[in-house]
């Protein structure tokens, strides 16, 4: 069952909306989904449906609520893509992490939550998933094609809970130097797994020109394998 009428209180006292996916069981782990730069789009809602079908509940907060509440942009429309990039440039990452922290707390307290919460993020959300992992805010964190992770590697030693990141070797946001930095630093932490696919940025979004079904299938299977650790023993 899906609902879009949820509100979460921020650290500053403001309230922001979230898209909720209720699990099909009375007790399930909750996945907090961190959006791409385009807002809570059909792709994000499809991701909620996928994870609910896999036995999880979902909370997807509107991370643009301070800048452009409830905005939904089409990555394939040039003017909307430019608008998304402008929002991303002005986005307050620290505020975004705090909002995810509030969403995680909200998720843990839901009546159908088993108390365990993961974060799964894409693009902007993939970078935020790394920050969540570095602060041990969730029980596990997963990022798809997170932007700028090579600038955050000083935080790798702080990651004490399972975290997984899916990256494309043809991602135009990831240089060869950035890839080397990520491989070197991520390899030093046993809690981290880094997976590379021969694809470009946004490879998991079905509407993207870079969409790759084979890579998405493998990445999503790995994601579900990690998330399964949060389920109640059968």
UniProtKB/Swiss-Prot annotation:
Alphabetized GO MF terms: carboxymethylenebutenolidase activity
One Pfam family named in its UniProt record: DLH
Pathway: Aromatic compound metabolism; 3-chlorocatechol degradation
GO biological process: catabolic process
Reactions that this protein is recorded to catalyse: 2-(5-oxo-2,5-dihydrofuran-2-ylidene)acetate + H2O = 4-oxohex-2-enedioate + H(+)
Keyword list, A-Z: Aromatic hydrocarbons catabolism, Hydrolase, Plasmid, Serine esterase
Keyword Membrane recorded: no
Superkingdom, taxonomy of origin: Bacteria
Protein's UniProt keywords contain Hydrolase: yes
EC number: 3.1.1.45
Active site: 123, 171, 201
Family statement drawn from the similarity comment of this UniProt entry: Belongs to the dienelactone hydrolase family.
Note: Carboxymethylenebutenolidase is specific for dienelactone and has no activity toward enol-lactones.
Subunit structure: Monomer.
Summary of the function given for this chain in its UniProt record: Ring cleavage of cyclic ester dienelactone to produce maleylacetate.
PANTHER family attached to this UniProt entry: ALPHA_BETA-HYDROLASES SUPERFAMILY PROTEIN, CARBOXYMETHYLENEBUTENOLIDASE-RELATED
Name of this chain's protein: Carboxymethylenebutenolidase 1
Organism annotation: Cupriavidus pinatubonensis (strain JMP 134 / LMG 1197) (Cupriavidus necator (strain JMP 134))
Organism lineage string: Bacteria, Pseudomonadati, Pseudomonadota, Betaproteobacteria, Burkholderiales
Gene: tfdEI
């Amino acid at each position: 069952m899906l609902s879009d009428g949820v509100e979460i209180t921020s650290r500053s006292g403001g309230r922001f909306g979230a898209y909720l996916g209720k699990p099909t069981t009375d007790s399930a782990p909750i996945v907090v989904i961190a959006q791409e730069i385009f807002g809570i789009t059909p792709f994000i809602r499809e991701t909620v449906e996928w994870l609910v079908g896999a036995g999880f509940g979902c909370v997807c907060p509107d991370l643009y609520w301070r800048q452009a509440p409830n905005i939904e942009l089409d990555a394939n429309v040039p003017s909307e893509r430019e608008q998304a990039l402008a929002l991303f440039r002005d986005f307050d990452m620290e505020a975004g992490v705090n909002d995810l922290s509030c969403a995680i707390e909200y998720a843990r307290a839901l009546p159908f939550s088993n108390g365990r919460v993961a974060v799964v993020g894409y693009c902007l959300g993939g970078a935020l998933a790394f920050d969540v992992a570095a602060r041990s805010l969730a029980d596990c964190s997963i990022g798809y094609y997170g932007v700028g992770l090579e600038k955050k590697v000083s935080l790798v030693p702080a990651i004490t809970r399972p975290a997984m990141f899916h990256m494309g070797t043809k991602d135009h946001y990831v240089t060869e130097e950035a890839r080397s930095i990520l491989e070197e630093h991520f390899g030093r932490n046993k809690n981290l797994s880094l997976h590379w696919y021969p694809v470009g940025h946004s490879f998991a979004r079905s509407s993207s020109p870079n969409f790759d079904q084979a890579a998405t299938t493998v990445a999503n299977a790995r994601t579900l394998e990690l998330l399964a650790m949060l389920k109640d023993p059968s």
